[in-house]
From Swiss-Prot:
UniProt-recorded name of the protein: Phenylalanine--tRNA ligase alpha subunit
Matching NCBIfam families: pheS (TIGR00468)
InterPro entries xref list: aa-tRNA-synth_II, aa-tRNA-synth_II/BPL/LPL, Phe-tRNA-synth_IIc_asu, Phe-tRNA_ligase_II_N, Phe_tRNA_ligase_alpha1_bac, Phenylalanyl-tRNA_Synthase, tRNA-bd_arm
Subunit structure: Tetramer of two alpha and two beta subunits.
Organism of origin: Streptococcus thermophilus (strain ATCC BAA-250 / LMG 18311)
Lineage, uppermost ranks: Bacteria, Bacillati, Bacillota, Bacilli, Lactobacillales
GO cellular component: cytoplasm
Matches recorded under HAMAP family: Phe_tRNA_synth_alpha1
Length: 347
């Protein structure tokens, strides 16, 4: 039998065997591939016979060998796809799916209490016509201090021990720089400026039950014509009553902040004893909750705002402070320790 006839028979017989392959024949398919196309396979053995052919026949037979190899390689690849598909279908046919079985329970997280407090406060201010403005946590000394009426070497800078990155770059100690930047750009011909600037701030404090090197503030600013201390008091009363209950009262005590004049500390009537005096309010009936005041004329002037024509008020409150008072939390570190047992209380 000549070599060409043997090649044709090998191709025909192999194709016939491949046509019979089913899903359970994956092992047989691999064995057949090795037996036909492997290094010691039938096609390789036939190829060795080329050397015995006359020189004029070798090109023709060599071409036929390559064609048979290509045809069988493609046939094996197609057969492998058929076998794999049949195997998958057989597996699907043998399995049943009970759609009435309950699914796997997934433990879902919840919003952190500080995020809940921030969103609640933001919603209150949005309802009062304020805008929310975000700013940079890494700030310049100029905007963090000088624009807040705290020039270099001002003694009040000691009140805010600061993380400096360079002599002029720092981690902001309050969100007031956002107010200064917004004040620079505001067009008062379109109306007064009413904004809050929530965010994280940093102080070089030693962490303990009441202090943290990072915490969250929400500072507010209103600037327009004829803004008075009465406007400030009315705004703060509305905020406090929405946060702590309509029966809450506030009182203003004189204080000092470089960027407001006059400045006040704001107290709220104790929500545990109703102002009668208890351990929470240290028998005074009042709890200190935030600082505020009328915007210092110098702060307005540095933004190019005429302090003779415009006035304003500013205030700042801490999210941690609000949460601790509302929920009786006595350690600020609880907010940052990631204890699931703590977080689950505020779902």
């Amino acid at each position: 039998m000549d070599l060409q006839t043997q090649l044709q028979e090998l191709k025909t017989s192999t194709q016939a065997k491949l046509a019979e392959m089913r899903g359970e024949h994956s092992k047989e398919l691999q064995e057949l591939r090795v037996a036909v196309l492997g290094k010691k396979g039938s096609l390789t053995e036939l190829l060795k016979g080329l050397k015995d052919l006359p020189s004029e026949e070798r090109p023709t037979v060599g071409k036929m060998v390559n064609e048979v190899r290509d045809v069988l390689t493609e046939a094996f690849d197609e057969a492998a796809k058929v076998v794999e598909a049949a195997k998958i279908q057989a597996q699907l046919d043998s399995e049943s799916l009970d759609v009435t079985l309950p699914g796997r329970q997934v433990n879902l997280g919840n919003r952190h209490i500080l995020s809940q407090i921030a969103e609640e406060i933001e919603d209150i201010f949005l309802g009062m016509g304020f805008q929310i403005v975000d700013g940079f946590e890494v700030e310049t000394d100029y905007y963090n201090f000088e624009r807040m009426n705290l020039p270099k070497d001002h003694p009040a800078r000691d009140m805010q021990d600061t993380f400096y990155i360079t002599e002029e770059i720092l981690l902001r100690t309050h969100t007031s720089p956002v107010q200064a930047r917004t004040l620079d750009k505001h067009d008062f011909s379109k109306g007064p400026l009413k904004m809050i600037s929530p965010g994280r701030v940093f102080r070089r404090d030693t962490d303990d039950a009441t202090h943290s090197h990072q915490f969250h503030q929400i500072e507010g600013l209103v600037v327009g014509k004829n803004i008075s201390m009465g406007d400030l008091k009315g705004t703060l009363e509305m905020i406090i009553q929405k946060m702590f209950g309509a029966e809450r009262q506030i009182r203003l005590r004189p204080s000092y902040f470089p960027f407001t004049e006059p400045s006040v500390e704001v107290d709220v009537s104790c929500f545990k004893c109703g102002g009668k005096g208890c351990n929470v309010c240290k028998k005074t009936g009042w709890i200190e909750i935030l600082g505020a005041g009328m915007v210092h004329p110098q702060v307005l002037e540095m933004s190019g705002v005429d302090s003779e024509e415009y006035s304003g008020f500013a205030f700042g409150l801490g999210q941690e402070r609000i949460a601790m008072l509302r929920y009786g939390i006595n350690d600020i570190r609880s907010f940052y320790q990631g204890d699931v047992r703590f977080s689950e209380q505020f779902k």
